[in-house]
């Protein structure tokens, strides 16, 4: 059974006149139905047809089957087994079917009679031997001329090519397999993009082609070696160009480079019946001619067959003996284009850059070849050769030379530094003086805020000692319009102005407690009391950094007793203190809600600002001192130098800067 299982063959001519569903219609498959309007597969032993749905075989699965037998035949003869085809033969058969397979009257494909000999030849291995076998088995092609090698060598080569896949043509032991870099001079390397070629051959470097498993046409043969036999190595006259096309398809040379405009007169056209249905040819399907094969192995990829290698100066690396034995091919003269010139210039520039990179990346290559070319060590009194890629023979020589340089240069630089004043040094001193003045003012401000803090605590303590007056007017806002409403800044609800402060304070505490402000370290400030909350949160592993008096998350307002006085200091004209206190009960006073907490928060916030200012000034002072220290250090004196053109004038500043 062939790989494409198609619809069954139509019935005989006598059955065409009968109805398809009639009584005399042929029946198929294990279901014994005459239905032929679906995918079917035939047994290669009993020639019985079966529906794919009944035996659970799809059309895609049938394409991978070479011979299929039904269950009854396999039970009768256990030697019958379903055979599957390889991927290469499957693709080749599908391409042959698309071009030349006969079709029946209903549009379906007919299954040709299986030919075991042809299948055995089609399943042969790759290589020259397999190509010759397939070429002789083709009914449309004449048998090719025999090669010089003996039949035993051909059989051995066929077995070797069958065992070796295309993707594993490396023995790993020869010199070509152990080579890791491209030569950059052969035709395959010059075709690569990294060497400026068009990348159309797409083969490995010839020096990296395995000498045991690679194709003969890809191997590198120097002038001393030759892939041909001694009988063929003798010089022979070149074959003249054919004046008329000869009907021998075995003399074609594979794929020609159409885009380069090369026309090979030695390649003869195929007969009309072969070219009527074009099909993609692989390297295995191409027949070979012995003479052309020897010429191809000798020098098919020389400067005549590769148009982009037409420069004589660039093709000098090819062996002249191989060029003489190359196939004579006609070329069509191409027009000179600017793109080709640009490619040549780009290739030359790339070669120069590559040589420069190799020189710096691998300096030990040239040194290893010529030990006498190694430079002498630069160490003091050392006569040894320097290490590859270094100026010294060892680390000790480098350290000795560096120490001698310091002893010789540093005293002179220190003397120059002391003689001429440094502008940056003077600017640094002025900046330090300004920073110190700002630090002093910040400390004074901090002391003032500490004094205000203690004064506030004294005022709060004295206010709590005041007596509550019941006869004092407690409803000062009753005369206002009771219909007036304002909106809360936190929740946006309308509220009465009399209770606005109380409502807004509670709303703020509720929303503020939903967010945490923390640091990984607690605050430690000498002389500061009651500044940050600093409550440790074990979940986030942080310390709370809100003000202690305003933190709604870790502190709550104490419960106010009924007889506690408000005690808020009364003012005149907003800022002028009168010296009196509010003596209303704290529960009834709506004007001075939480006045102690707000006053304490005001003082604490100002103290925090002063501490931040001091911290910033300390950081500036540290940076300036570090710069001044490094300016006269060893590294700075060795790297930088100021040249004094007038030795009598040591001060290089202008009169305005002095």
Swiss-Prot record:
SMART domains: PHD. GO terms for cellular component: cytosol; nuclear matrix; nuclear speck; nucleus; Set1C/COMPASS complex. The modification Phosphoserine is found at residues 6, 19, 226. Disulfide bonds: none annotated. Residues 153-163 have a biased composition (Low complexity). One of its GO terms (biological process) is positive regulation of DNA-templated transcription. Residues 428-470 form a coiled coil. Zn(2+) 1 binds at residues 171, 174, 177, 210. Zn(2+) 2 binds at residues 183, 186, 189, 205. The acidic domain carries the potential to activate transcription. This is CXXC-type zinc finger protein 1. It comes from Bos taurus (Bovine). The lineage of its organism: Eukaryota, Metazoa, Chordata, Craniata, Vertebrata. The gene is CXXC1.
